[in-house]
């Protein structure tokens, strides 16, 4: 994972991918180190911007999301990307090769909010020649990309049991406060989280249990992928026969290179958007050949190499890929 990062750090990040809220006692047991060692290693990864845990929408939380692509005027891409990155509903921003040299992922609590973003606010930003958007309608992969640092036994040991499901819960202002506080650090202690939102600790503990068991709140672990030995990111737009979209999505999820894979609706011929993390650009051709062999009907419509990633799930990234600041992802913010 770059200078100063060793196999234990890789294994620690991998364990937290599988179980973002695992205690340091659990992590130490799985990794066969003292809990204090696991804690010290994690604090160093966080303080240097190499890894972080943050809140994320659970599978039962109602939301809408879109892919927004733009062709920027010459010399304007960086300024446009900075403006995009400052918007709380824009959770990822990347500058790429190709005519459409910027893409962003946008998320909102409902369709009117999403429309206000992709129809009104984003296209009005100065420096754009052309824009297009598509709804993201089915997520195949996005929060569980791993480094391969754990043995099968360690994977089984650290993977949590599925939470017992309870009836649906509608998000309120208290829930939003918790979600936004946990954007900064998803592993905040109950005491620190209670202080951040100004509520009693027992109340915070009960509400978090409710949100996670209701499936409206989840957590994700991210890392500086450039630092992890995967410096090359590519984005592909695929055209797949409608009946095969789910099968192709499931196949792509199995590939270790796949970082994010989603079904698109309303984006023209393209109906799958996938990003991949590679050691080198030359590694892409074997991946495409593998996919074509498994699904001969898949057509690759567009391939772009990411030149600069400015934002990833709310984290503002430096040129070295490390987190340098946070713009909390806020689905409910006014546009």
What do the predicted segments below correspond to?
Residues 1-335:
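A compositional/biophysical signature of low hydrophobicity enriched in polar/charged and small residues
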